[in-house]
A protein has these predicted regions:
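Bacterial N-terminal signal peptides that target proteins for export
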Residues: 1-7
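Short, well-ordered surface patches within globular domains
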Residues: 154-160
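Extracytoplasmic cell-surface/polysaccharide-interacting catalytic and binding patches
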Residues: 20-151, 165-264
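Hydrophobic helical h-region of N-terminal Sec-dependent signal peptides
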Residues: 8-9, 13
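N-terminal signal peptide c-region/cleavage motif recognized by signal peptidases
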Residues: 16-17
Length: 264
């Protein structure tokens, strides 16, 4: 386990150009074009950081340095969005302290189409990592199985990149995308006191395309029975009947660790 310090993982974009009024229910053609131009500039940089194993630690300053003022203003609108106006379970969460230490996980391997594939390097704050390690030791003792970390800590800047990346899958709607990918500053993945982990089996099951596939796992039943002993809780259970479209989607793979005494 290697430790990394959270240096400046959150920061302000210094902008002077006029602000956009981003459409929440579906981008118009200009907004789609702006998003596309941003992704074309950022994709090579993010891919390079993935190869280095440091994509989850990307800062807003690093994103901004690769964008025009107009593109930066567009990003800033997402950072300023009121979670209550967007809907779902969004809420502002505590940012990482500058002295937060992270464990680096870079030797995880899963099967994809029957072939071993290395999981992108992941990071977890040390308290969450230590609790995860204890929990997996107990699961292995009980079941002879364990779960891997498909996604751990993600800086707010990386979270914003992912939000934009997944928007086409959700009809370019901010509200609908937010049901599946939290806004920057609102994701448990970016808040060490409530650190999220997206689990995946060594066999490659993560439930992303069919949540029921993960829900049916013996490991999922074990988590329901024992995860709380280690400080982990399911973040997005099945929406109750008649709860409406605004509620966050069911994510059986997404659990978060709560540091003792952590308060919103």
């Amino acid at each position: 386990m290697r430790l990394f310090s959270a240096l400046l993982l959150t920061g302000a974009l210094c902008l002077s150009s006029p602000a956009f009024a981003v459409s929440l229910d579906g981008f118009d053609e200009k907004e789609k074009a702006t998003r596309l131009s941003i992704m074309q500039r950022l994709n090579p940089f993010v891919e390079e950081r993935k190869q280095e194993g440091t994509a989850p630690l990307i800062t807003f300053e690093e994103l901004r340095a690769r964008l025009t003022l107009e593109q930066g203003s567009f990003l800033e609108e997402f950072r300023k969005m009121d979670p209550a106006a967007v809907g779902g379970a969004s809420r502002r969460l505590p940012a990482p302290a500058p002295d937060t230490l992270f464990a680096r996980l870079d030797r995880q391997v899963v099967l994809r189409d029957g072939k071993p594939v290395r999981v992108d390097t992941q990071f977890l704050p040390t308290p969450a990592y230590e609790a995860y390690a204890r929990m997996m030791a107990a699961m292995e003792q009980d079941l002879g199985k364990r779960l891997l970390v498909e996604s751990g800590y993600r800086s707010p800047a990386y979270q914003l990149f992912l939000f934009l990346f997944y928007m086409p899958k959700h009809s370019y709607s901010v509200r609908e995308t937010n049901r599946h990918v939290a806004l920057p500053g609102c994701s448990e993945h970016g808040s060490p006191p409530f650190q999220a982990i997206d689990f995946i089996t060594p066999g490659g099951i993560n439930g992303e395309d069919r949540p029921e596939e993960f829900e049916e796992l013996q490991e999922y039943g074990w988590l329901h029975a024992r995860a709380k002993e280690f400080g982990f809780f399911l973040s997005y259970p099945r929406p109750s009947a008649g709860s409406g479209q605004g509620e966050s989607a069911f994510e059986p793979w997404h659990w978060h660790y709560e540091e003792p005494g952590a308060l919103l």
